[in-house]
Amino acid sequence: MALEQTRDGDVVIVSWNDGENRYRGDSVAEWHEGLDEVEATDGPLALVVTGTGKFFSNGLDLDWMSAHPDESGDMLRGVHRLLGRMLVMNLYTVGAINGHAFAGGAMLTCGFDERIMREDRGYWCLPEVDLGLPLTPGMYATVAARLPQATLHDSIVTGRRYGGAEALVAGIVEHIAAEADVLPLA
């Protein structure tokens, strides 16, 4: 399984460990199963989500979508549902952004109540403009729910890559930290 759940007291930590952590049919289903487990847990909880290696998430797996056209629509609906679930979860959510968060990975970070990004490496980016892919209404709603208006416009229209310090100034994240401190701070 690409998602590993651990628990530290009242905090559930989900680590996504699948290379570039891209959304495919199986990974989206695994996300929903994992969130079902978290939501079924008794007691007060917080949820921390992180990636592994140099990637938080690089978003949709476009190669998988091209190879599985009959399943791509369901997978994309599953991603929309995931983004919506994260926005309204009935527990505090924190993104421990360990590395690159691009496209759907950047959108996922906008579902968290709080975001902590590595200060020295990794970019947060919505590159859809460079790929010629428009944001769906659900994707737009997710990023619009969390980003300041000027940052929302800049990130969508230009595809700008924000490093940790720039993401902090732009209001994308609330905190930046050294690599070793991102998860503990979360």
Where are these regions (language model features)?
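Amphipathic alpha-helical segments at domain termini/boundaries
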Residues: M1-G19, T158-A186
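Hydrophobic/aromatic residues within transmembrane alpha-helices
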Residues: V49, L108-C110, A167
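Short helix- or helix-capping micro-motifs
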Residues: N58-L60, V143, T151-R160
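Conserved CoA-thioester-binding segment of acyl-CoA-metabolizing enzymes
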Residues: M1-T52, G84
